[in-house]
Amino acid sequence: EPQLCAFLWRKRWLGRWVKQLFIIREHVLLCFRCAKDLQPLLRLELRGCRVAYRAKPGKEVQHELKVTAAAGAALVIGFTSRQHAEDWRKVWRCRS
């Protein structure tokens, strides 16, 4: 059973944003292209990850969380509000 689930913005190559389904289960972040997908596009172990909030006023997506894995890979996720980003950051901190 997921602890948190939502369609969020994911920053892709060349700064383009795509909306994808993110689910946190236990200590793993899963990213799916759509709700019908059975296999995740991305599976990120949250243990050992660092999470940082960044505000980007005047941009298309104004609230971002940058998740950096222990291996060094980074994932940038966009939110519609600061509160929404903070809610996700709290869950990530509990799971990491």
Where are these regions (language model features)?
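Phosphoinositide-dependent membrane-docking surfaces
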Residues: L29, E45-K56
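Polybasic phosphoinositide-binding surfaces of eukaryotic membrane-targeting domains
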Residues: E1-L44, W88
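Canonical pleckstrin homology
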Residues: L14-Q20, V51-S96
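Residue-level detector of conserved, well-ordered beta-strand and adjacent loop positions
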Residues: W9, R47, T68
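A short macromolecule-binding patch
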Residues: L44-E45, V76
